[in-house]
Amino acid sequence: MGARIGVIGLGRIGRYHARNLLTTDGVDALVVTDVDARRTPDVASELDVASAADPDPPLASGIDGVLIAASSSSHADLIEAAVRRDIPTFCEKPVADSIESSVRVLATAEQTSVPVQIGFQRRFDPSFVAAYDAVRSGELGWIH
């Protein structure tokens, strides 16, 4: 049986992620929600997936993971709510809208073994390029 994933935030990026999740092996179902009450049913209908009126029901409904693409100001609270329910979490950047909130999220996450990933790719960062080149050249040996 595949995973049931919650998607919170259905703007451009949230919709993009939801569409990709629907074609991902191992994902059987999505539950989508957005703070815009009109957007949620429209996107749910468009994608033919379940919906919820607000983020709490998906987090309380036995989902296997959550993808947060909501407004930046809501990230910290949503990450913490998911982690406290032992739900593996992927959140678009930024992790929070302040240093204090970021520290709070980190402290909450460190109290559990729940995976949390922030979608902050650095593909063209010089340090990443150097690490990528080292892996590709075999300089670091076999990476798994």
Where are these regions (language model features)?
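Short beta->alpha connector loops
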Residues: 11-13, 71-74, 122-124
